[in-house]
Regions:
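Short, flexible loop motifs at catalytic/binding sites
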Residues: 1-223
Length: 223
């Protein structure tokens, strides 16, 4: 009898933990990443990402110096958490090279296949034919598509577009690089966003002409 009660208590505790991880991004992060050391900036980023998840925030720009966990949060853990919460979601992940974007896709895909993820989101898995790291689907109709800045997004629509460091160090040294990224953004992600969708831009600042600078000026003119 006591053993049965203990099992029920443990099961209830696990269900409560799962619910907390499903609803609170930092709880999910700590569950997936036990060695994670939380800082004040993590709390601020997590609060904003949760607002995106709830549909309260449609545009989010995160500017930080390198080595502050911004990519791990925005391009690895966040899309996985969002897929768990909304497994029919269409996510477009972009960064300055296709190779790097595909690498993020591989990490998210691998995370979804772990026991830790399946414990929190037991109904979510990859579609059986999802082999490629840069283009895969969930069992619930969700889609993940990795792309380099400048690449064609024809035929791709996204509920969530994540742009992580759109400028490489090389392109940041040229004015053309900034203009090319802006042209791609206005002709690609912004046009391909589904109604009600969100865009998250994460980057290290390079110049007032970079994508963050262009967006801030654009929003000031047309909020």
């Amino acid at each position: 009898q006591d053993e049965r009660i203990l099992k029920l208590e443990l099961r209830l505790a696990q269900l409560e933990k799962n619910e907390e991880c499903q609803n609170t991004f930092l709880s999910f992060v700590k569950n997936i990443w036990p060695s994670f050391i939380q800082g004040r900036h993590h709390e601020i980023i997590a609060e904003k990402l949760e607002r995106v998840a709830r549909g309260e925030l449609k545009r989010l720009i995160i500017n930080m110096a390198p080595r502050h966990t911004k990519s791990e949060f925005a391009s690895f853990l966040f899309p996985a958490w969002m897929m768990g919460r909304s497994p029919n979601m269409k996510i477009i992940q972009a960064t300055h090279t296709t190779e790097l974007a595909v690498n993020f896709g591989r990490k998210v895909k691998n995370l979804i296949e772990t026991d830790e993820f399946k414990t929190v989101f037991p109904d979510v898995s990859l579609a059986v034919d999802s082999k490629a790291s840069g283009r895969w689907d969930t069992n619930k109709g969700g889609m993940y598509y990795a792309v380099g800045v400048g690449s064609n997004l024809a035929g791709r629509g996204g509920d969530l577009v994540i742009i992580d460091d759109p400028h490489s160090e090389q392109t940041a040294m040229s004015n053309n690089g900034f203009e090319d990224a802006w042209d791609w953004y206005t002709g690609g992600p912004r046009q391909r966003l589904q109604p009600g969708g969100s865009i998250v831009l994460v980057q290290t600042r390079w110049s007032e002409k970079d994508l963050t600078g262009q967006l801030v000026r654009s929003m000031a003119k047309d909020p």
